[in-house]
């Protein structure tokens, strides 16, 4: 039976609502007779702002509350930044759709005092704000003379902290800045040879209940095949390494002539050890490429690095 109403669970942050409202508008265009409502809520990751993300714990930090709404029948789908969605989902739920990816790169944002600087020219001891261990480890590897400081809160709050002088610069996702209308604050797109992006960064993931094919049929209009293949390879790589969203694992993926090339990286928190490699194969079988690349990095010592990190940033009781 065709659905007449679709309920979307979403985080209530400004960026999440921009993303969810885009999904809502696109689905309304594709299905004019469908009534779509949004239920916005705060997640654990939204509520705890005085503890580093890695110390809170990793599993479903920004997704668990949304998934609970679907599991009890109060929502049919949930919209996530794909980089926040764990690779192992709760029983009964599935990743139903991956939307077209925007620029997945990290971006440098500076305050007025540092307007003439790029990453390469920041002075010794300049304070870089980031809440991501992935960005932290890679930037420490390339720029050990810089100082790094955790930064939490939504994008607007972070920009206010930057402009008030708490930080010399911030590292943020380019896609998030663009979606919020802050593309003009992007001072430099950080190249992949300096900072590989997060798994799924720049794409949205729509999660849904497994046993409702009518819901899957509705959301599949937003599926972007190229993005989906790239992100499935990236997620398989992350899952095989048993890494979560808050560990120093970075990726880049490209598809050319039906060949998918995946680059992956694991680094120690101090940036002194960084393992990077790539794997290629048929874009029609993306997960096998992610699994192959994870095996390569494990063989080079990635497992030992990740174990050290898990022990070091083990969530506080």
Curated annotation (Swiss-Prot):
Q: What is its EC number?
A: 2.5.1.61
User: Sorted alphabetically, which Pfam families does this protein's record hold?
Assistant: Porphobil_deam (PF01379), Porphobil_deamC (PF03900)
What cofactor does this one take? Answer: dipyrromethane
Question: Mind listing the GO biological process terms from this record?
Answer: chlorophyll biosynthetic process; protoporphyrinogen IX biosynthetic process
Arranged from A to Z, the UniProt key words for this protein are: Chlorophyll biosynthesis, Porphyrin biosynthesis, Transferase
Establish whether keyword Mitochondrion is in the entry. no
Molecular function terms, GO-annotated = hydroxymethylbilane synthase activity
Q: Which reaction does it catalyse?
A: 4 porphobilinogen + H2O = hydroxymethylbilane + 4 NH4(+)
Give the sites modified to S-(dipyrrolylmethanemethyl)cysteine. 245
Give the UniProt entry's GO cellular component terms: cytoplasm
The cofactor binding remark recorded in the entry reads: Binds 1 dipyrromethane group covalently.
- Pathway(s) the chain acts in: Porphyrin-containing compound metabolism; protoporphyrin-IX biosynthesis; coproporphyrinogen-III from 5-aminolevulinate: step 2/4; Porphyrin-containing compound metabolism; chlorophyll biosynthesis
Q: What does this protein do?
A: Tetrapolymerization of the monopyrrole PBG into the hydroxymethylbilane pre-uroporphyrinogen in several discrete steps.
Additional information = The porphobilinogen subunits are added to the dipyrromethane group.
Q: HAMAP family from the entry?
A: Porphobil_deam
Quaternary assembly: Monomer.
Instruction: Name the family the entry cites.
Output: Belongs to the HMBS family.
Protein name (database record)? Porphobilinogen deaminase
Q: Which organism is it from?
A: Parasynechococcus marenigrum (strain WH8102)
């Amino acid at each position: 039976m065709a659905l007449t109403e679709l309920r979307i669970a979403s985080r209530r942050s400004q960026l999440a609502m921009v993303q969810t409202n885009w999904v809502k508008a696109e689905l309304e265009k594709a299905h004019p007779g469908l009534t779509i409502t949004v239920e916005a809520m705060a997640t654990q990751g939204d509520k705890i702002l005085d503890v580093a993300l890695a110390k809170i714990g990793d599993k479903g930090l920004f997704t668990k509350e949304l998934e609970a709404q679907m599991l009890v029948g109060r929502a049919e789908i949930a919209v996530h930044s794909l980089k926040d969605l764990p690779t192992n989902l709760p029983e009964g739920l599935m990743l139903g759709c991956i939307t077209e990816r925007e620029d997945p790169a990290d971006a440098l944002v500076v305050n007025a005092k540092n307007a003439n600087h790029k990453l390469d020219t920041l002075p010794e001891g300049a304070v870089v704000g980031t809440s991501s261990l992935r960005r932290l480890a890679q930037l420490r590897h390339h720029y050990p003379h810089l100082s790094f400081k955790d930064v939490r809160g939504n994008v607007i709050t972070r920009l206010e902290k930057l402009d008030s002088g708490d930080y010399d610069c911030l590292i943020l996702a380019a896609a998030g800045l663009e979606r919020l209308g802050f593309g003009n604050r992007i001072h430099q797109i950080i190249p992949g040879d300096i900072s590989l992006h997060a798994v799924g960064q720049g794409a949205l993931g729509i999660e849904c209940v497994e046993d409702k094919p009518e819901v899957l049929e509705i959301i599949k209009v937003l599926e972007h095949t190229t993005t989906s293949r790239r992100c499935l390879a990236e997620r398989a790589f992350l899952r095989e390494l048993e890494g979560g969203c808050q560990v120093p694992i970075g990726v880049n993926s490209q598809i050319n002539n039906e060949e998918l090339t995946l680059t992956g990286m694991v680094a120690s928190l101090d940036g002194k050890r960084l393992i990077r490699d790539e794997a290629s194969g048929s874009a029609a079988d993306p997960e096998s490429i992610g699994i192959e690349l994870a095996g390569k990095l494990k063989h080079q010592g990635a497992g030992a690095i990740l174990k050290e990190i898990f022990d070091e940033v083990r969530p506080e009781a």
